[in-house]
């Protein structure tokens, strides 16, 4: 079958998806296609994006196909109607795909619609990621008890060794016979005889997924889903080499010029290049602006649905040959790393808009960020906890640290620009200025310096001998103060109280200024003392937020700051030394947000 075939005469149209197949086939196909599969409805008005269709072909042909576009002067999206949908499976690899027949949108042709009142029988299904034992030559397939009861024919449990033969049909119509047995010391449900032949024929490996579907009448279906790393481009057996190289744009253009139907091949794991007309309009009206927060669905390594959160950092054409195209027009920045690949540019209809500081995105991000920063900072951050959480155990652990360990911890924090204000932002604790250190230190000091007169020994040390132990918090404070002063002023000064320690810590890191970008949950910090002007500041901010020249261009982002009097102004209007002396916090806003701030008089013009 060629993806670019042009049908010049209208065939007899069917009112259901793939009329030659049963509802059971459709359900099995969708489960094998995966959770992110989105097939348009029969008769639905859609937009067809040739760019997305091109992504299905081999990478070696993409450049040649892109070069055809200026010659053809073809639009980036085409309005069509869905005429027919055929759900199919590739013969050699069992990969699912759909043949979708499209026709240029016209009122002259009666388009069939899917019967929503069609009888839908109840089906039970389950999927399982295959283990090494499941794919072993000498093993069998272990079925979880819950799934065996729901999806497999019932066993006669009155027998000494409950056993039965079951018959399952795959997407090709082939029949597979398995022996279902309930045995073993763990009393497991197993598929034994026939399972090895199935795995060998399908070339199943560890990590693939097996799918079983059972209907109300007891009909059993079986399918597979390859692991993500085995998924390739569209097989050459589906689309010919000639069609891949020349047919996509040429056939679509011919169909629109002559108002005839054409067929496209749609793979479930490919990006959605056939988009519902209503969905596209919702996206256009939603207006995803630079700085907007979003979430996007992905399929994880275990075939479950995952969600990733990010920020839109730009809008641009994905290909120079398709101007003003919505296809992958949004440049995005992801909040955190993931074990699965994610694109740097996405289409507007692939993402969901989030309101600023959404509880979902904020809690998800901070959950991972918090665990990572706790491991990086270690016990040296325990002084940030409120008094109710800072007990003698934590302080005792800190007192065991040597001066060398303390210096290393403090150096790591300062070198990573982890100022106290930034650390506090990452944890749901009270600000340091509100902590009553006297209440924390005094009771512990009193307990430690109490004279013990009873004849008791602890770890071989007599408790009867009066002893005085220095306050561990003060010891740590003295060491941090000494290191700070030696590093900055080349001299040694001793701080005598926790209040002085706190004040000195803030003053010693004053050169680090907090930077917050619109749409990004966690801020950054920049050291203005090592920069020589606004140009270096802009370059440093681009590195921190991975903006790659977008701040210099100033066509999508603006930089603002607040001074000591909380006045907010745009960066660049003051002499650099004066700016460094008065800046309190730096902000990166989108152009739209700057306009809003000026309209509310929250930003000085």
UniProtKB/Swiss-Prot annotation:
Gene Ontology biological process terms in this record: auxin-activated signaling pathway; regulation of DNA-templated transcription
Q: Which domain of life is it from?
A: Eukaryota
Identify the residues that the record assigns to the PB1 domain, covering every copy: 510-602
What cellular-component terms does GO give this entry?
nucleus
Gene3D superfamilies in UniProt: 2.30.30.1040, DNA-binding pseudobarrel domain (2.40.330.10), Phosphatidylinositol 3-kinase Catalytic Subunit, Chain A, domain 1 (3.10.20.90)
Any keyword DNA-binding?
yes
**PROSITE patterns, from UniProt?**
B3, PB1
Which of UniProt's keywords are assigned here?
Auxin signaling pathway, DNA-binding, Nucleus, Transcription, Transcription regulation
Which positions does the record tag as DNA-binding?
A: 126-228
Q: Which Pfam families match?
A: ARF_AD, AUX_IAA, B3
Q: Does the keyword DNA-binding apply?
A: yes
Q: What does the UniProt entry say about where the protein is found? A: Nucleus
Matching CDD domains, A to Z? B3_DNA
Select a single GO molecular function from the record's annotations and give it.
DNA binding
Q: What range does the record give for the signal peptide? A: none
General function of this protein:
Auxin response factors (ARFs) are transcriptional factors that bind specifically to the DNA sequence 5'-TGTCTC-3' found in the auxin-responsive promoter elements (AuxREs). Could act as transcriptional activator or repressor. Formation of heterodimers with Aux/IAA proteins may alter their ability to modulate early auxin response genes expression.
Q: Domain annotation text?
A: Interactions between auxin response factors (ARFs) and Aux/IAA proteins occur through their C-terminal dimerization domains III and IV.
Q: Tell me its family.
A: Belongs to the ARF family.
Q: Which PANTHER family match?
A: AUXIN RESPONSE FACTOR 12-RELATED, AUXIN RESPONSE FACTOR 4-RELATED
Subunit details: Homodimers and heterodimers.
What is this protein's name?
A: Putative auxin response factor 14
Q: What is the source species?
A: Arabidopsis thaliana
């Amino acid at each position: 079958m060629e993806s670019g075939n042009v049908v010049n005469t209208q065939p007899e149209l069917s009112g259901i998806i793939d009329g030659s197949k049963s509802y059971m086939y459709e359900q099995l196909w969708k489960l094998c296609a995966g959770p992110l599969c989105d097939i348009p409805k029969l008769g639905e008005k859609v937009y067809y994006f040739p760019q997305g269709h091109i992504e299905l072909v081999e990478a070696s042909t993409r450049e040649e196909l892109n070069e055809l576009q200026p010659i053809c002067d073809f639009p980036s999206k085409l309005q069509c109607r869905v005429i027919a949908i055929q759900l199919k499976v590739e013969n050699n690899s069992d990969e699912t795909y759909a043949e979708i027949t499209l026709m240029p949108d016209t009122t002259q042709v009666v388009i069939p619609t899917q019967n929503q009142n069609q009888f839908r029988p109840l089906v039970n299904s389950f999927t399982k990621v295959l283990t090494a034992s499941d794919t072993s030559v000498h093993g069998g397939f272990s079925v979880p008890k819950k799934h065996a009861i729901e999806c497999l024919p019932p066993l006669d449990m009155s027998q000494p060794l409950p056993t039965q033969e079951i018959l399952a049909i795959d997407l090709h119509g082939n029949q597979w016979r398995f022996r279902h047995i309930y045995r073993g010391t763990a009393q497991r449900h197993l598929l034994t005889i026939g399972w090895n032949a199935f795995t060998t024929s399908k070339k199943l490996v560890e990590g693939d997924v097996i799918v079983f579907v059972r209907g109300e009448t007891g009909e059993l279906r079986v399918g597979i889903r390859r692991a993500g790393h085995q998924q390739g481009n569209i097989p050459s057996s589906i689309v010919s080499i000639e069609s891949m190289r020349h047919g996509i744009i040429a056939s679509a253009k011919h169909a629109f010029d002559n108002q005839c139907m054409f067929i496209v091949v749609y793979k479930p794991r490919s990006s959605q290049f056939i988009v519902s007309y209503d969905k596209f309009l919702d996206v256009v009206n939603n207006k995803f602006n630079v700085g907007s927060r979003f979430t996007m669905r992905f399929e994880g390594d275990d075939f479950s649905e995952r969600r990733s959160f990010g920020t839109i950092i730009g809008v641009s054409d994905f290909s120079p040959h398709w101007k003003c195209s919505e296809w992958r027009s949004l440049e995005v920045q992801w909040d955190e790393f993931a074990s699965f690949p994610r694109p740097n540019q996405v289409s507007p209809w692939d993402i969901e808009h989030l309101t600023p500081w959404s509880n979902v995105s904020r809690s998800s991000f901070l959950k991972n960020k918090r665990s990572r920063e706790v491991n990086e900072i270690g016990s040296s951050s325990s002084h940030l906890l409120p008094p109710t959480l800072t007990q003698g155990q934590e302080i005792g652990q800190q007192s065991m640290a040597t001066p060398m360990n303390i210096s290393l911890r403090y150096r790591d924090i300062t070198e990573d620009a982890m100022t106290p204000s930034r650390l506090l932002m990452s944890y749901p604790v009270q600000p340091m200025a509100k902590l009553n250190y006297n209440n924390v230190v005094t009771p512990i000091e009193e307990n430690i310096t109490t004279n013990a007169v009873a004849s008791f020994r602890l770890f071989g040390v007599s408790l009867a001998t009066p002893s005085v132990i220095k306050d561990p918090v003060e010891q740590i404070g003295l060491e941090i103060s000494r290191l700070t002063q030696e590093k900055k002023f080349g001299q040694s000064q001793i701080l005598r109280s926790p209040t002085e320690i706190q004040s000195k810590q803030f003053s010693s890191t004053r050169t680090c200024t907090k930077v917050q970008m619109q749409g990004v949950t966690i801020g950054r910090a920049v050291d203005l003392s090592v920069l020589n002007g606004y140009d270096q500041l802009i370059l440093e901010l681009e590195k921190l937020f991975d903006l790659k020249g977008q701040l210099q261009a100033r066509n999508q982002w603006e930089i603002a700051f607040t001074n000591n009097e909380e006045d907010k102004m745009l960066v660049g209007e003051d002499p650099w030394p004066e700016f460094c002396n008065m800046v309190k916090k730096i902000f990166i806003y989108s152009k739209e947000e700057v306009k809003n701030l000026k309209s509310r008089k929250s930003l000085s013009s």
